[in-house]
């Protein structure tokens, strides 16, 4: 199969996908209600889409093409409100977060869709363990070569995205000591990690053709990279975010991506090289493990600094681009919480210390997703 041509999209437009938990309101464990939710949601006219995911206790929502983080929030609000109404009819709840805190992976059932069944056959138990929940952000790129430059420039900020969205400290009722344990599950897949450092579409086509000749890859969907090109949309897709507990944070993260992308296009601040990736895995691990308390190694200088400080410096640096694109409020929210060391992983741990029972933590997380201020 040849690589699809890179389609035109309006630069800096946004699209957001969120994978969400469906839980029983009796015990707040995952509940196999995806099919029922999809049936109810089909009756509601909404922007974007609502589709099944790998197992039948999760669904994915997505916005349409948006021009700002406020438009993202507006569309997510419409979809969220419809989800909540449908869930109430089924006596279930919808919850954010990168992992469910106490579900047992072996109890999961693969959703009855050919691609999911194929993946289950190929990956075995990993498919059920893939009951994890991420946010994906698409950003429109002017052309194919610009998309690859954008992808590799964004790679320096992967630790930012991980720490700011981290919401998966618990796995099977245990505190993993990671802020984002979700990404450990992604690393188990053979085509995960990062894209090859090529900066022209012709080079990328050569790489893709070599991979397809091996028989290992049939399409771009087979790559589980942290960031991957999406030629059919004319975007790159950033895939490292945990699903936040609130749609407000999800929209703010999209605003941060858009502000970074605007800076890249306006100033071309640096040319990515293979050496950028010498510290990539280390920085990624630090952000997963320690969140906003991580150490960040600058790929260009080799300097070590607190990740929190690097995020705050970058937020200040892109502030004028945020203003141009209506993301100032989003960045203000992220700046305030970063300065306090506050992310969703910390909120979940604080609730657990106070409540003890993870089911109660999940119940309160469901209320936060509904828009309650807890």
UniProtKB/Swiss-Prot annotation:
The record's Gene Ontology biological-process terms are: modified amino acid biosynthetic process
Q: Keyword set for this entry? A: ATP-binding, Ligase, Nucleotide-binding
According to UniProt, the reaction catalysed is:
L-cysteine + L-glutamate + ATP = gamma-L-glutamyl-L-cysteine + ADP + phosphate + H(+)
Asked if the record carries the keyword Membrane, the reply is no
Q: Does the keyword Nucleotide-binding apply?
A: yes
Q: SUPFAM superfamilies annotated for this entry?
A: Glutamine synthetase/guanido kinase
Give one Pfam family, short name only.
GCS2
Identify the EC number(s). Answer: 6.3.2.2
Which InterPro entries does the record match to this protein? GCL_type2/YbdK_subfam, GCS2, Gln_synth/guanido_kin_cat_dom, YbdK
> What Gene3D superfamilies would the database entry show?
3.30.590.20
Q: Name one GO molecular function term.
A: ATP binding
NCBIfam families on file: gshA_cyan_rel (TIGR02050), PRK13516.1 (NF010040)
Which HAMAP family does the record cross-reference, listed alphabetically?
Glu_cys_ligase_2
Q: What does this protein do?
A: ATP-dependent carboxylate-amine ligase which exhibits weak glutamate--cysteine ligase activity.
Protein family membership: Belongs to the glutamate--cysteine ligase type 2 family. YbdK subfamily.
Q: What is this protein called?
A: Putative glutamate--cysteine ligase 2
């Amino acid at each position: 199969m040849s690589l699809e041509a890179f389609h035109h999209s309006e630069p800096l437009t946004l699209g957001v996908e969120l994978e969400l938990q469906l839980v029983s309101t009796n015990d707040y464990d995952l509940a196999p209600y995806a099919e029922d939710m999809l049936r109810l949601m089909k009756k509601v006219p909404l922007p974007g889409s609502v589709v099944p995911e790998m197992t039948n206790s999760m669904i994915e929502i997505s916005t349409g093409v948006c021009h700002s983080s406020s438009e993202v929030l507006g569309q997510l609000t419409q979809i969220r409100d419809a989800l909540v109404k449908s869930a109430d009819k089924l006596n279930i709840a919808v919850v954010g977060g990168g992992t469910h805190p106490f579900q047992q992976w072996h109890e999961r059932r693969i959703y009855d869709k050919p691609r999911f069944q194929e993946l289950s056959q190929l990956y075995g138990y990993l498919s059920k363990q893939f009951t994890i929940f991420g946010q994906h952000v698409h950003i429109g790129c002017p052309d194919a070569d610009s998309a690859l430059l954008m992808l590799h420039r964004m790679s320096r900020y992967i630790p930012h995205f991980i720490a700011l969205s981290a919401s998966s400290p618990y796995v099977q009722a245990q505190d993993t000591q990671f802020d984002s344990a979700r990404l450990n599950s992604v690393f188990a897949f053979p085509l995960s990690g990062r894209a090859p450092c090529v900066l022209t579409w012709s080079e990328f086509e050569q790489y893709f053709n070599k991979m397809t000749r091996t028989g290992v890859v049939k399409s771009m969907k087979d790559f589980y990279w942290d960031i991957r090109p999406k030629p059919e949309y004319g975007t790159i897709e950033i895939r490292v975010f945990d699903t936040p507990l609130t749609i407000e944070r999800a929209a703010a993260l999209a605003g941060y991506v858009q502000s970074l992308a605007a800076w890249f296009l306006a100033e071309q601040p640096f040319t990515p090289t293979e050496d950028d990736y010498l510290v990539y895995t280390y920085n990624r691990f630090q952000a997963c493990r320690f969140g906003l308390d991580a150490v960040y190694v600058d790929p260009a200088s080799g300097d070590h600094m607190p990740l929190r400080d690097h995020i705050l410096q970058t937020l200040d640096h892109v502030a004028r681009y945020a203003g141009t694109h209506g993301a100032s409020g989003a960045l203000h929210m992220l700046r305030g919480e970063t300065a306090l060391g506050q992310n969703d992983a910390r909120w979940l741990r604080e609730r657990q210390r106070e409540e003890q029972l993870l089911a109660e933590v999940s119940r309160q997380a469901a209320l936060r997703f509904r828009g309650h201020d807890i």
